[in-house]
A protein has these predicted regions:
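Loop-centered beta-sheet repeat module
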Residues: 166-176
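GST-like domain detector, emphasizing the conserved glutathione-binding G-site
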Residues: 2-144
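A conserved mid-domain beta-alpha-beta active-site/ligand-binding segment of alpha/beta enzyme cores
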Residues: 145-164, 168
């Protein structure tokens, strides 16, 4: 599906079922009762819609509004929607609660990603089949099921060493 095929007045969430931040935005949209269409970020969608909408970046999630605006970054998406949909706010009313809420979000968005990525990527014996199938399903959903996992190889290779790089993990550290 390309952006020119969006004839109605819906929100479109471009992302992946295995993206933590896509899940965050999807959960918010469900919580608020905001109708949306979820579009899997396949290679074609990245090339035809996401990259042009984000100045060449291959990032998800991206939310396309009914007015045709594209918003990237889960926090910015939620902030924009919160200002437009004020019922059932996710922002607590009191200042102390807002501080605690912001700290929880910071913890979840910035710090819990490290152990999540560690357990996703550093246990290949247990996770590799799932990873290849999940990325293959996202990137190459129209391929025959028997070979769809092959579509997951490139994204898996791209992400595989990111957790180690960010955490400063190397072979010497792992041997101790």
């Amino acid at each position: 599906m390309t952006s020119s095929q969006h004839a109605d007045n819906s929100f479109y969430l471009y992302g992946s079922p295995v993206s933590f931040y896509t899940v965050k935005v999807r959960s918010y949209l469900h919580y608020k009762g905001i109708p949306f269409v979820e579009v899997r970020a396949t290679n074609k969608i990245f090339k035809e819609f996401i990259e042009p909408a984000t100045d060449g970046w291959r990032v998800i999630p991206v939310l396309k509004t009914p007015q045709g605006h594209c918003i990237q970054d889960s926090r910015i998406i939620l902030d924009e929607l919160e200002s437009a949909y004020t019922d059932r706010s996710i922002t607590p009313p009191g200042l102390k609660q807002q501080v605690v809420s912001s700290l929880f979000e910071l913890l979840g968005d910035e710090w819990l990603v490290f152990p999540a990525m560690h357990y996703r990527w550093n246990f290949k014996k247990h996770n590799l089949k799932y990873i290849l199938n999940a990325f293959g399903q996202s990137r190459s959903p129209h391929w025959p099921k028997a070979v769809r996992f092959l579509g997951g190889i490139m994204p898996a290779l791209m992400f595989a060493n990111v957790p180690r790089f960010i955490l400063g993990i190397n072979k010497k550290i792992l041997q101790h």
